[in-house]
């Protein structure tokens, strides 16, 4: 780290830099997923299968709404990474200030809309009647906590854009440990049920955001802004929106397909919902390395594009994809032997139907993890390069795939069809993303050549 607690990713071995930057991210994501797993285990084991299904039934809509907020925050950090790579401190600070103001506005709007529409959303999703009330209790708290989500994601994005992936992870780990403790306190001691599980999530994330504020105030002068930096500038706001909104919509568009799929699975009953919930939680844990590599590539490509080092972007993408593919093969082989034991963490072995369906879902998805590697590495690389719109279209491909499975095949073939929804989504997204990356790289290289030629 430099004196500004930042790291320059424009020099040095791409593979070494990617591993060094992604490992702290991976550690944080693993802790986050450990919390998610513990949360699900506590709900499933100490409350009921109905409570597990209720929390699981909200997963796709949470992904749609919370994912939009996270995507926007991630997009807002990309111009900052580019300005850091270009050594433009004045522009960097202006983006930091403007992103903060715009994020406050987004937080207010999103919180108000989602809280007001919470009940209607669950009805539209065909939530089973026996879990509707529990699902509402959980979802309303998550929506009310959107400002806490935006606070942490925005500030951690600021830090990562400067090459600092360690501090956000430390605060995330603190939040995850706190979250587990609060889960146990609220559910086992205070008997707050699924409401307590949601409240623990929001409270711990808010604390992690406050920790980011304290750290930045004390240790990162590069992110300190003046009153002038907080005045909205139309050109800066426009660039933030060009980067942030496509990333937010990418998450939401992808999630729309997940919502449609979840709605179809909801129609199969609580057993199917619980099965997909357990398997999805395990899968989310297993794919953390892909998410870490993706987040790394966004910062890596952003800094290198800012420094006009486009060939390093290509080399970095290849390195990240190879690392992820090797891991994919290893984890699939491991799951062949341990999948059922992981499922037993969520439900009793006596729940044979849930175990069988969860096993089928998990192994089917794991077989297609290599396409998922490419989705993460290529998409985030394109976003870091400044072409967020292309990444959004990949989200459309994923939405189409999941919607097709949910609307057409699940009603005919049942739960087995749902198992292939994500694999099909990943393959269709890759069919768009790989050519899009080649196009974006050529476009940047051509622009650089034109600038050089114009000097002579």
Describe each PLM feature range.
Residues 64-67, 179-183, 209-213, 285-288, ...:
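Hydrophobic transmembrane alpha-helices of multi-pass small-molecule transporters
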Residues 20-39, 141, 175, 204-208, ...:
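Transmembrane helical elements of multi-pass membrane transporters/channels
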Residues 52-112, 149-168, 275-339, 372-386, ...:
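Small-residue-rich hydrophobic transmembrane alpha-helices
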Residues 9-46, 60-75, 79, 104-111, ...:
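N-terminal transmembrane alpha-helices
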Residues 1-22, 80-145, 189-245, 301-368, ...:
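Short alpha-helical transmembrane segments in multi-pass integral membrane proteins
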Residues 20, 43-63, 129-134, 194-195, ...:
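Interfacial/gating helices of multi-pass transporter permease domains
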Residues 30, 34-52, 122-129, 185-192, ...:
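Helix-terminus/linker motif at the lipid-water interface of multi-pass membrane proteins
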Residues 73, 141-160, 168-176, 197-212, ...:
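Short runs within selected transmembrane alpha-helices of multi-pass transporters and secretion channels
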């Amino acid at each position: 780290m430099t004196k500004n607690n930042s790291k320059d990713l424009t020099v040095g071995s791409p593979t070494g830099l990617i591993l060094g930057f992604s490992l702290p991210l991976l550690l944080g994501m693993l802790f986050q997923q450990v919390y998610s797993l513990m949360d699900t285990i506590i709900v499933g084991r100490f409350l009921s299968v109905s409570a597990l299904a209720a929390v699981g039934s909200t997963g796709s809509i949470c992904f749609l709404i919370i994912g939009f907020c996270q995507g926007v925050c991630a997009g807002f950090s990309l111009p900052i990474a580019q300005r850091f790579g270009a050594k433009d401190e004045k522009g960097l600070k202006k983006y930091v200030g403007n992103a903060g103001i715009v994020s406050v506005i987004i937080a207010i709007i999103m919180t108000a809309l989602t809280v007001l529409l919470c009940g209607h959303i669950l009805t539209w999703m065909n939530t089973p009647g026996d879990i509707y009330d529990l699902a509402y209790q959980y979802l309303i708290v998550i929506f009310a906590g959107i400002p806490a989500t935006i606070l942490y994601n925005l500030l951690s994005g600021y830090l990562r854009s400067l090459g600092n992936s360690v501090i956000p992870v430390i605060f995330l780990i603190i939040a995850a440990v706190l979250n587990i403790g609060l889960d146990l306190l609220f559910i086992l001691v205070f008997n707050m049920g699924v409401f307590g599980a949601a409240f623990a999530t929001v409270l711990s994330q808010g604390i992690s955001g406050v920790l980011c504020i304290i750290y930045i105030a004390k240790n990162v002068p590069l992110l300190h802004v003046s009153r002038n930096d907080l005045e909205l500038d139309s050109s800066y706001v426009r660039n933030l929106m060009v980067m942030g909104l496509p990333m937010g919509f990418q998450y939401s568009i992808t999630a729309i397909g997940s919502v449609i799929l979840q709605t179809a699975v909801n129609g199969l009953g609580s057993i199917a919902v619980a099965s997909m919930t357990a398997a999805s939680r395990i899968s989310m844990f297993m794919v953390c390395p892909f998410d870490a590599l993706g987040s790394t590539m966004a910062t890596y490509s952003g800094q290198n594009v800012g420094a006009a080092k486009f060939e390093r972007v290509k080399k970095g993408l290849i390195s990240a994809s190879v690392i992820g593919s090797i891991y994919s093969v290893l984890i699939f082989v491991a799951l062949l032997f341990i999948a059922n034991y992981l499922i037993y963490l969520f439900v009793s072995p006596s729940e044979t139907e849930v175990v069988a369906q969860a096993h089928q879902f998990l192994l089917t998805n794991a077989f297609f993890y290599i396409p998922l590697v490419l989705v993460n590495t290529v998409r985030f690389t394109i976003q870091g390069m400044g072409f967020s719109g292309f990444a959004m279209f990949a989200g459309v491909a994923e939405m189409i795939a999941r919607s097709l499975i949910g609307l057409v095949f699940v009603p005919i073939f049942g739960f087995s069809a749902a198992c292939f929804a994500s694999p099909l989504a990943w393959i269709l997204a890759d069919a768009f993303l790989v050519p899009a990356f080649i196009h974006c790289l050529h476009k940047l290289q051509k622009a650089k050549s034109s600038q050089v030629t114009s000097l002579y």
